[in-house]
Amino acid sequence: MADKLVPSSPADASEPLFSFGVIADIQYADLEDGYNYQRSRRRYYRHSLIHLQGAIEDWNKESSMPCCVLQLGDIIDGYNAQYKVSEKSLELVMNTFQMLKVPVHHTWGNHEFYNFSRDYLASSKLNSKFLEDQIAQHPETTPSENYYAYHFVPFPKFRFILLDSYDLSVLGIDPSSPKYEQCMKMLREHNPNVELNSPQGLSEPQYVQFNGGFSQEQLNWLNEVLTFSDTNQEKVVIVSHLPIYPEASDSVCLAWNYVDALSIIWSHKCVVCFLAGHTHDGGYSEDPFGVHHVNLEGVIETAPDSQAFGTVHVFPDKMLLKGRGRVPDRIMNYKREEAL
């Protein structure tokens, strides 16, 4: 919608309540440039680190310093595992992040699981759960250790929730485990192809091996947190590697059970924005319930003369995404409260 891309009021010039940075799909590898699986888009494996350095330099000198940065997953490329340099590449990227003056919240994508097991990630620097906020009086809002998700409060009356969109997945877990068997059964029920990464002929093309989903346990937890946020009159931003809204994403990139996640979000009034990566070419749509779904353009497919990151400035009535390079600016107005 065109009206989302133009300033809506003179208040745009006022100071934001707070700001935060967003970046997705860095997918660094010490490799020559290559192409995506369809060989239709170029990938700049080495230059992604230079893009990250540029983003950090920008964030560090912004007048409205971000309170944190959301890293939306796929921090290093799966090729690192083939060359047995996963730990080395991760260390290089994490050392680059050390130059940033604010905390980073990391989500986990498919490329994390091409390189590392879930157990490894849980004890790595990519586990940013230590940054979570807990609601002491409401233990039901404390996440289980069975999935990687948490919530935090960057500013009073705003809550950010990081989801684990590979909670249901055949990636990164022991093939002899019951959960692997359960997830493989689920995948094969929806995808009869020999090549499980192929969506060919599928009525639900999101059921491919490079995607995943949300367990009922995690969805129940999400529902509890959103219930608290409704009661507490908070505005909520949800963060996930995988997108959940078809109008904002290629259907082959959606979370397996995106419908279940949407139905919970739509049963609450507090969610204002859902941020995801994974698609690389970006996407945006406002759903019928006024939730803004933003899929961030991926660093990995961004030419050396461009950029792909953004800063979101948060105001009492809206969020303004100030994009860099191929990330477009967006004005995301909060849905109006229904008249009493």
Swiss-Prot record:
Keyword Metal-binding: yes
Function: Hydrolyzes ADP-ribose, IDP-ribose, CDP-glycerol, CDP-choline and CDP-ethanolamine, but not other non-reducing ADP-sugars or CDP-glucose. May be involved in immune cell signaling as suggested by the second-messenger role of ADP-ribose, which activates TRPM2 as a mediator of oxidative/nitrosative stress.
Subunit structure: Monomer.
Residues binding Zn(2+) 2: D74, N110, H241, H278
EC numbers: 3.6.1.13, 3.6.1.16, 3.6.1.53
Organism: Mus musculus (Mouse)
UniProt gene name: Adprm
PANTHER family: MANGANESE-DEPENDENT ADP-RIBOSE_CDP-ALCOHOL DIPHOSPHATASE, PTHR16509
Annotated family: Belongs to the ADPRibase-Mn family.
Binding site for Zn(2+) 1: D25, Q27, D74, H280
Protein name: Manganese-dependent ADP-ribose/CDP-alcohol diphosphatase
Cofactor: Mg(2+)
Keyword Acetylation annotated: yes
InterPro entries for this protein: Calcineurin-like_PHP_ApaH, Metallo-depent_PP-like, MPP_ADPRM
Keywords: Acetylation, Hydrolase, Metal-binding, Zinc
GO MF: ADP-ribose diphosphatase activity; CDP-glycerol diphosphatase activity; metal ion binding
Enzyme class: hydrolase
Lineage: Eukaryota, Metazoa, Chordata, Craniata, Vertebrata
Residues the record lists as N-acetylmethionine modifications: M1
Pfam families: Metallophos (PF00149)
Reaction(s) this enzyme catalyzes, per UniProt: CDP-choline + H2O = phosphocholine + CMP + 2 H(+); ADP-D-ribose + H2O = D-ribose 5-phosphate + AMP + 2 H(+); CDP-glycerol + H2O = sn-glycerol 3-phosphate + CMP + 2 H(+)
